[in-house]
Amino acid sequence: ENINLDISMRPRHKRKRGRKKFLAGVQQKTAVKEAIIFLVRFNLFSIPLYAAILTGFQWGFLMDITSNIVVALLSSTGIETTRHGNIIAVPVKDGNFGAFVSWDSTGWKSMLAMFALIFATAFPLRKKLMGLALIPVVYAVNILRIWFMFFISTVDTNYFALAHLTIWSWGLIFTVLALWVLWMKKL
């Protein structure tokens, strides 16, 4: 018995299924390759973040600006504040509550992560440069995060840790990822 494996001899519906499987396999391999390229690029563009962490680099100017903006925002929303360097204090029920606006409080990691996410994509340079406009948005959300933590402290200082460690740490990560996805889809 002679079996001819020529695809043209197979019924038409089986040929289509064979092509679909082949194309699905090619698309899957392409998607894996693109994901690997993205991850490599992301890590390369994250080198400034890694370098700053390893060297202990801190930019005091950004800490000062962040403190100034937060104090102005707190004051403009009716919350009395005092500031000593980068320590901001607000009145609470039994006295004052203060917190230090540290280097990590500036949102620098989130801003660098946003930069790396944008530039790791395969989009044209023009779109990437337009995406950089989202970095100030990340900074503004971070400022609101700090304001909210001081605001919630005026209600009850026990809420500060919850707001800081849980809600806003994850909230800032979510914000960066949501802005990045929005940028990829819409902008």
Language-model features: locations:
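Hydrophobic N-terminal alpha-helices or hydrophobic patches in metabolic proteins across all domains
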Residues: 2-187
